[in-house]
Swiss-Prot record:
Disulfide bonds join C52-C163, C180-C188. InterPro entries: 4_helix_cytokine-like_core (IPR009079), Somatotropin (IPR034975), Somatotropin/Prolactin (IPR001400), Somatotropin_CS (IPR018116). The gene is GH1. This is Somatotropin. GO terms for biological process: animal organ development; growth hormone receptor signaling pathway; positive regulation of growth; positive regulation of receptor signaling pathway via JAK-STAT; response to nutrient levels.
């Protein structure tokens, strides 16, 4: 992220977050289609919902709550969400060795790093260049399990992909709320 106007920094961060969220959603669907019998999907989704680590972060749960928070707070939450996945996604490509969707998986880590840098650039701009130490995650997500012949591994990966999709949706929402608050545009209705 070279020096550029704040509006461009926000636009780039939102585009990166949207792309990552779409990639996470596509991956989740591809995994579900390949490994989870249709009759089990709903019950497994409900069981997995309680296991997202990000639920322990006191972050807003939707657009309305996000609008009550400052931009710096939303950037910090977004950064925490992104950083919590940097380790686990490095194992993602090994899980999907034969998948068309995951021809792009090797780049997921780079895309997350890109977004992390973009969020950090926004934080520097909004905090007058003096970033304060934020919350550091003492715990993060487990790595994806590469043993796809085990039911436990399948369920673990399914749950992780569900959380990955949810967390990227949150980060995208926070970035869009901030962008819309600062730069009213026609694309702000979501």
């Amino acid at each position: 992220f070279p020096a550029m106007p704040l509006s461009s920094l926000f636009a780039n961060a939102v585009l990166r977050a949207q792309h990552l969220h779409q990639l996470a959603a596509d991956t989740y669907k591809e995994f579900e289609r390949a490994y989870i019998p249709e009759g089990q999907r709903y019950s497994i989704q409900n069981a997995q919902a309680a296991f997202c680590f990000s639920e322990t972060i006191p972050a807003p749960t939707g657009k309305d709550e996000a609008q009550q928070r400052s931009d710096v707070e939303l950037l910090r939450f977004s950064l925490l969400l992104i950083q919590s996945w940097l380790g686990p996604v490095q194992f993602l490509s090994r899980v999907f060795t034969n998948s068309l969707v995951f021809g792009t998986s090797d780049r997921v880590y780079e895309k997350l790093k890109d977004l992390e840098e973009g969020i950090q650039a926004l934080m520097r701009e909004l905090e007058d260049g003096s970033p304060r130490p934020g919350q550091v995650l003492k715990q993060t997500y487990d790595k994806f399990d590469t043993n796809m012949r085990s039911d436990d591994a399948l369920l673990k990966n399914y749950g992780l992909l569900s959380c990955f999709k949810k967390d990227l949706h949150k980060a995208e929402t926070y970035l869009r709320v901030m962008k819309c608050r600062r730069f009213v545009e026609s694309s702000c209705a979501f």
